[in-house]
């Protein structure tokens, strides 16, 4: 019985470690998406302060291609929406993993109390 308890303890501890790593990765992805969204919003604000006749360029790989300001704004707004959706999805994932971590910690505490 003791061997099974040790094995269950180590498996639960490993699961807790894996879940914690997953949660940290998701938090990093949330931060990256939020930073990208902020950059897009700043760029949109800067573009709106320019006159409509100003030539604008879009980065394509290592080169820049002339692009109408309206299409740049549209692409940036779409990117902002995509980033917001990504953040919402990632927040849901983090809540789910957080609940799993809580459950796993509870199981780990029960195993420790058993001994």
UniProtKB/Swiss-Prot annotation:
GO biological process: one example: protein folding
Chaperone in keyword set: yes
GO cellular component: cytoplasm; prefoldin complex
Keywords for this protein: Chaperone
InterPro entries to which the protein is assigned, alphabetical: PFD_beta-like, Prefoldin
Keyword DNA-binding set for record: no
Gene Ontology terms for molecular function: protein folding chaperone; unfolded protein binding
Subunit structure: Heterohexamer of two PFD-alpha type and four PFD-beta type subunits.
Job description of the protein: Binds specifically to cytosolic chaperonin (c-CPN) and transfers target proteins to it. Binds to nascent polypeptide chain and promotes folding in an environment in which there are many competing pathways for nonnative proteins.
Family: Belongs to the prefoldin subunit beta family.
Name this protein carries in UniProt: Probable prefoldin subunit 1
Organism annotation: Dictyostelium discoideum
């Amino acid at each position: 019985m003791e061997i099974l308890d040790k094995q269950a303890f180590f498996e639960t501890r490993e699961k807790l470690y894996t879940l914690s790593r997953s949660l940290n990765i998701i938090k990093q992805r949330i931060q990256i998406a939020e930073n990208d969204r902020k950059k897009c919003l700043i760029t949109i604000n800067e573009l709106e302060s320019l006159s409509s006749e100003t030539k604008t360029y879009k980065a394509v790989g290592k080169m820049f291609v002339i692009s109408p300001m309206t299409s740049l704004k549209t692409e940036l707004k779409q990117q902002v929406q995509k980033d917001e959706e990504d953040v919402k999805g990632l927040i849901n994932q983090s809540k789910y993993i957080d609940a799993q971590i809580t459950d796993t910690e509870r199981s780990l505490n029960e195993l420790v109390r058993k001994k």
